[in-house]
Amino acid sequence: MASRFDRPLRTASLRFVDLETTGLRPDRGARITEMAVVDEGGVRYDWTSSHDPPRDEAVAAQLPQLVAHLDDGIVVGHNLSFDVRFVTYEAERLGLDGIDVCFIDTLGLARRVLARAGSYRLGAVLAAVGAAPEEELHTAVGDALATRTLFWRLVERGGLGTLADAGAKRLRWHGR
């Protein structure tokens, strides 16, 4: 029986995601300030808080929209565990539903494909594969676009053909 991860990468609906935050730890008060989802057609979703720190009601209104843009695709992000930690923390704190998605982390993929890279920060691995960012890094849209470029360069370098080859996994978290 074929696994859902046997699907060719070129035919998968990929959603490249990034968040920007006020800090590193949501449990110590850091909050989401920007969220973006990009696909092969461009920016699907882009939100930036107009308040510092972001208001709970704004984040509560935006998280379901973010998840809706991820539900029908394979989520791809760089150091995705960081973003997932913030999304799950905020969703739990605000009483929102959980998520059930398949994902690929380009950080792990870069460590596999570029085994001798000196740094695995997004800008460094982008440069290591000979690519430049389309937009400014350290913005949600800029990093999501850079992740898309990085992903396809890693796929090419690694000779990867399927979701399984790229290390796709399933993430299930149920809120409320």
Segments (PLM) and residue ranges:
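Acidic two-metal-ion nuclease catalytic site recognized across multiple nuclease folds
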Residues: 1-9, 148-176
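Conserved non-catalytic scaffold segment of RNase H-like nuclease domains
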Residues: 1-101, 115-116, 120, 124-138
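Alpha-helix N-cap/helix-start capping motif
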Residues: 80-84, 107, 144
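A short, structured active-site edge motif that brings together acidic residues
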Residues: 100-111
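A charged, well-structured terminal subsegment
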Residues: 136-153
